[in-house]
Amino acid sequence: MVKVAAFVCGVASSGKSTFCGALMSYMKSVGRSCHLVNLDPAAENFEWEPTVDIRDLISIDDVMEELDYGPNGGLIYCFEFLMENLDWLNEEIGDYDEDYLIFDMPGQIELYTHVPILPALIRHLQVTLNFRPCAVYLLESQFLVDRTKFFAGVLSAMSAMVMMEVPHINLLSKMDLLKDNNNITKAELKRFLNTDPLLLTGEINETTNPKFHELNRCIVQLIDDFNMVNFLPLESGNEESVSRVLSYIDDATQWYEDQEPKDPDRFEADDLEDDE
């Protein structure tokens, strides 16, 4: 049977842990087996207690204190230490057959866009433990208010997609907070979800320094040429929204294809007697 590893990624405060908790709650409510894996060595609080926790192996506080590293350097060191101790990870997660593992990842963007550690970890899970990985990248919907920030987020998402090389789902999180913003129409929202690169030209060029216009044009061309980044809306507090995202993860990992058909419910003896 299939084993799925969903890596929930994104910048700090994008709602990763909240989404992980919502996904865990929904899957438990529909009877699906899942476990939370915390790979953030600086994490503090969780809605669901992690089944596997990198802090049992190494803590970023210890690294920063003993090696005098900053937060980002400490995080990279923790992941390098994890890669040197994959036997620990194999032992922790190797027994979870036919299960979903939801990986709650740190918020440092360089881990997804610049450093090759995470792709190496994903390949290990694929080859050694036979997991089917999927990346779920969260971008906060409030970025839509500032188009330049939104496209910076799009470029980060695209960089993560290229770096990680696994099925990838991009989410605009905290959509419930966007409902109070009357400056974004439904038509505009659709353009953001489909990442219309022309949103970066026109009005923006009227308010930015002319020396950046050519840069804007090049970014538009890059996004248009790759045509990789689209978004799904996410409200972590909305069960229907979480269910929809889960269906996309299932499709990306081909989870449905490996499910055995269930036997039809049998009539109870009393029901059969009544029919007679």
UniProtKB/Swiss-Prot annotation:
Kindly give the InterPro entries that the UniProt entry links to this protein.
Gpn, Gpn3, P-loop_NTPase
Instruction: Give me any GO biological process, just one.
Output: protein import into nucleus
This protein is called what? Answer: GPN-loop GTPase 3
**Pfam annotation, one family:** ATP_bind_1
Renumbered to this chain, motif Gly-Pro-Asn (GPN)-loop spans 70-72
Residues given in the record as GTP binding sites: 13-18, 173-176
Q: Per UniProt, which keywords does this protein have?
A: Cytoplasm, GTP-binding, Hydrolase, Nucleotide-binding, Nucleus
Q: Where is this region: Disordered?
A: 257-276
Residues of the site described as Stabilizes the phosphate intermediate: 72
Organism lineage: Eukaryota, Fungi, Dikarya, Ascomycota, Taphrinomycotina
- Where's it found, cell-wise? Cytoplasm; Nucleus
Please name the SUPFAM superfamilies in this protein's record.
Answer: P-loop containing nucleoside triphosphate hydrolases (SSF52540)
Top EC group: hydrolase
Task: Tell me the function of this protein.
Answer: Small GTPase required for proper nuclear import of RNA polymerase II and III (RNAPII and RNAPIII). May act at an RNAP assembly step prior to nuclear import.
Assembly: Heterodimers with gpn1 or gpn2. Binds to RNA polymerase II (RNAPII).
Q: Which EC number applies?
A: 3.6.5.-
Return the GO cellular component terms, semicolon-separated: cytosol; nucleus
Q: Which organism is it from?
A: Schizosaccharomyces pombe (strain 972 / ATCC 24843)
Annotated family: Belongs to the GPN-loop GTPase family.
Asked whether the keyword Membrane is assigned, the reply is no
* The UniProt record lists the keyword GTP-binding: yes
